[in-house]
Amino acid sequence: GGIPAGDVEKGKTIFKQRCAQCHTVDKGGPHKTGPNLHGIFGRATGQAAGFAYTDANKSKGITWTKDTLYEYLENPKKYIPGTKMVFAGLKNEKQRANLIAYLEQETK
């Protein structure tokens, strides 16, 4: 099964509620508790310049795509054991798809 079609506006709401306290998405945006996410699609884990990642994130060695984000966001600590991201994950497939649709648009 592929990823369901996502709704950007609904994804924006999820981002504001669940992600924005630790992450920014705009180009040149600051790192907060978590790294700025601009340009995340096609980038390897643990590679945003100037952010202090855990070794787990640096050594995971995958590239962020819709598919890897979809799996990661369901259960971050299972996907990258040792990550310091405290987010428990989004179990709802549609919510993950919406969030990814928003990220795809906003991090370019």
From Swiss-Prot:
- Binding positions for heme c per the UniProt entry: C19, C22, H23, M85
Q: Which keywords belong to this entry?
A: Electron transport, Heme, Iron, Metal-binding, Mitochondrion, Respiratory chain, Transport
Signal peptide span per the entry?
Answer: none
Q: Which GO terms describe its cellular component?
A: mitochondrial intermembrane space
Enumerate the subcellular locations listed in this protein's record, separating them with semicolons.
Mitochondrion intermembrane space
Q: Which GO MF terms does the UniProt record name?
A: electron transfer activity; heme binding; metal ion binding
On whether Metal-binding is a keyword of this UniProt record, the answer is yes
Q: Sorted alphabetically, which InterPro entries does this protein's record hold?
A: Cyt_c-like_dom, Cyt_c-like_dom_sf, Cyt_c_1A/1B
> Carries keyword Translocase?
no
Q: How is it modified after translation?
A: Binds 1 heme c group covalently per subunit.
**Would you identify the family this protein belongs to, as annotated?**
Belongs to the cytochrome c family.
What PANTHER family does the record tag this protein with? CYTOCHROME C (PTHR11961)
Name the UniProt record assigns to this protein: Cytochrome c
